[in-house]
């Protein structure tokens, strides 16, 4: 699952640079000097890219963090790209690294199997995820879990159920919006998407247990970016305890399902899976233990914090700043709504996915928003990429998607929000230069659902409300989010003429 950036996925949680550097020093000091004592014959090969390892222990991490907090977070990579080329060596997060802003190199690494590269994450995240997480699993077990998840998330049956649930949940939320005055899109989207995703994963309906799970999830997610110190009172310790409580609840649900199956209930055994737990239990593999199932259900919940809600929120922001795009989006969605109303039909998932311009808006939001800045892999052996580049064993390779998505050689006027660029663009031909959710064997299996959920939200928003967007800015580190949660003031949209329904108080850059 590629829905995690190289520093994890912490949503609204952010650590000052000093704490991050302290974490790096604690986890990297011994490893740095151990590497320095090893023979460096591999490093002397000509195919190793040029670059700088920076300072001892911290390497160039301080410079990366400084750029990440700035208005141009890609400046760290772009400056070195001018000096050394699109691929260069560095030292980040306690590891020697090859940084790639080259679309073809990144694609080659993503397509490589576990015999060449394995996932790499910071120490705190590895401790929190555990060895059974799909984020770190390898080999046949990873392929099995990923394949089962991908098939389930892409199934028409799930999309149909999710569409009904999402429409109902969005409608209920928006009914209450006019009483709120100011609505924070990011918070609303997180609440909606979490409940929808949890139901799809473990079959849990809104109620007391859902509320409890959401509370524990907030504590859990806070530890994804934290000091790698697992002592009582630390954030990592609290997050691990929260995960244990979540796992206990999920394992109770798993056990209840197993008891129904063992009780001779043929309907429970033979009917189509209703959630992801059913899918994994039906596989029959002894490797898919209750612990593995519960751990991975928690991992699959992470996109409900920092992927789909941020995609929705950024789309609202960019539309608020682009009246022509908003107008065309509203016209398209109003036309669909009128057409369905005329025949007394209800909107189905295929209707939402048929909205061409809406899909262009989502695609452009993914490109310019860069919800996932990049990912990291670790070379398990000396790896040659494209016959020219050497990545030594033990080094990490950091695939920096943001610089690719904002590359003027690939996209005209790359910093402009321009959904129309995708009208004539061949998505297959552009695939190496467009990797918002990673790629290869670890491509996020929920990509289709992310698009569907965003489409449903935007449809109901533009056909129900006018809105005034308040000032807000995009924060890109440690994860992408809106600083104030994207506050908007909404009013009922009575007009159906297709006139743009926004008024923004700010025209901000990305």
UniProtKB/Swiss-Prot annotation:
Superkingdom assignment: Eukaryota
GO biological process: brassinosteroid biosynthetic process; brassinosteroid homeostasis
Transmembrane feature ranges: 6-26
Signal peptide (residue range): none
Required co-factors: heme
Keyword presence, Protease: no
Keyword Phosphoprotein: no
Protein name in the entry: Cytochrome P450 90D2
Organism expressing this protein natively: Brachypodium distachyon (Purple false brome)
